[in-house]
Amino acid sequence: MKILIVAATKFEINPLLSLTEIISFAENSRVIKCSYKKIEIDCLITGVGMVATAFYTAEVLNKSYDLAINMGICGTFNNNLDIGSVIHIYEDQFAEMGAEDGEKFLSMEDLKLEAITKITNEAQSEIYALLEHLPK
């Protein structure tokens, strides 16, 4: 079995890495190759943000994985979640579209910028519709 673990920072997956045998990690590489029992694990460190995560994940997905898992805080600002909790995502937001005021995250709605969010969502839907027609 071959697994891809995606995380923004190495810090977020250090508990996992401590249980594995590190096979290779070049300083200029974003992938830490390791194993656990007979399972091959590639840990991809993307950097923070949805753009970095999408870009670097797309780069490694040309390899064949049996399972891909996004680990770490995954952009959440929910302090009620315990460290180590497993979360099933059924809805998502543009987490980076907002701001922090020093104490909390302010959404586009909080900032009274919902119209921009709506336009962005509509543009995203149009982009997805266009992409469906591209040859694979």
Q: Which role fits each region the language model picked out?
A:
Residues I3-F25:
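N-terminal beta1-alpha1 ligand-phosphate binding loop
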Residues K2, A26-K136:
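Glycine-rich phosphate- or other oxyanion-binding loops that anchor nucleotides, phosphorylated ligands
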